[in-house]
Swiss-Prot record:
It comes from Methanocaldococcus jannaschii (strain ATCC 43067 / DSM 2661 / JAL-1 / JCM 10045 / NBRC 100440). This is Putative nickel-responsive regulator. Binds 1 nickel ion per subunit. Belongs to the transcriptional regulatory CopG/NikR family. GO terms for biological process: regulation of DNA-templated transcription; response to nickel cation.
Length: 141
């Protein structure tokens, strides 16, 4: 049998309620099993992103609370350090509190990964989604 460690985490009530609804909907036997699956998915995504190499093109979508302490300024400051890979940006106001920033990128996968990691670590950022592809000339016929 696999050795298990017991941990304790703090979550916002609304987030836990939504997670519990998904647990019930998917028929999990326990909250712990659902959390293990979520952690496995997170690890797989992390490994995939960190295995990318070579020239890539894609987008980084960032949802953030624009009321959070200077998050917009920090996002802009970070972007200025990656002008070698940023092709364009699009800013969308989602509601009174939240914005979506989509950053189109093209360049070395390592630089794209660095930019994604820096944006993910910012306080006030709610979600970051990276979508990458190989440039057209590298797609097999």
């Amino acid at each position: 049998m696999t050795e298990m460690d017991r941990i304790s985490i703090s979550l916002p009530s609304k987030l836990l309620r939504e997670f519990d609804e998904i647990i019930a909907e998917r028929g999990y036997a326990s909250r712990s099993e659902a959390i293990r699956d979520a952690i496995r998915d997170y690890i797989i995504k992390h490994k995939w992103i960190h295995s990318l190499e070579g020239e890539r093109a894609g987008s980084i979508s960032v949802i953030y609370n624009h009321h959070a302490s200077d998050v917009m300024e920090k996002i802009t400051e970070i972007q200025h350090n990656y002008t070698d890979i940023i092709v364009a940006t699009l800013h969308l106001h989602l509601d009174h509190d939240h914005c979506l920033e989509t950053i189109l990128v093209r360049g070395d996968a390592k630089r794209i990964r660095e930019l994604t990691d820096r944006l993910t670590a910012l306080k006030g950022v709610k979600q970051v989604k990276l979508s990458v592809m190989v440039p057209g000339g590298q797609i097999p016929e």
